[in-house]
């Protein structure tokens, strides 16, 4: 997958040179480029923003450097142009899975009070991280790109690494434990030490269902319980 990020602060994306994403870049599974929007301004002082027509607080990113940077990147990257903004569709795991199927993507990070409306003509999709205010689009872009990239084939060692994670299947993840088996008087559940893979699988599913219902009832309501789920919960409750 190739991703180009249009931003005023390309140095912020150096985080992708590390850990799982960094290794995927080294293996050429991923290619993440940053493009400095400021390099495309025709203003002699390298300005990319100006005062809003009609008055108001703050500054607005000008259309010209945004549009020119998009046009240039589009010569090599034919992917969708995604703007990180408050009016967009709220990002979630389903959208991450959808975008992970793409071979190329372009992300546009806004700043200041927003972007000139005329730049929207070159944008295919707008995504919001949530109902809160951030300093700039970069803050939203980093977790969104990370979430998408880790679903690309080959980035993680196996699909099981993400299929069991919170939100992937609509539920929160089950509790995890590691050594020692007992810490400060608290022991790891016996089923996890049993080596019985089917029982472990059922325990994890039951815990995932119970935790989701308790912590995120909104997610639980959307989740469609199967007959197997109901049986797992019933058997689990009998053992309590």
Swiss-Prot record:
Q: Which CDD domains match?
A: TrmD-like (cd18080)
Task: Specify the enzyme's EC class, one word.
Answer: transferase
InterPro entries xref list: Alpha/beta_knot_MTases, tRNA_m1G_MeTrfase_C_sf, tRNA_m1G_MeTrfase_TrmD, tRNA_m1G_MTases_N, tRNA_MeTrfase_TRMD/TRM10
Q: Name one GO molecular function term.
A: tRNA (guanine(37)-N1)-methyltransferase activity
Q: Which Gene3D superfamilies does the entry mention?
A: 3.40.1280.10, tRNA(m1g37)methyltransferase, domain 2
Query: In the Enzyme Commission scheme, what number(s) does this protein have?
Result: 2.1.1.228
Q: Which GO terms describe its cellular component?
A: cytosol
Function as written in the Swiss-Prot or TrEMBL entry: Specifically methylates guanosine-37 in various tRNAs.
What is this protein's record name? tRNA (guanine-N(1)-)-methyltransferase
Organism, per UniProt?
Clostridium botulinum (strain Okra / Type B1)
Q: What is the lineage of its organism?
A: Bacteria, Bacillati, Bacillota, Clostridia, Eubacteriales
* Gene, per the UniProt record: trmD
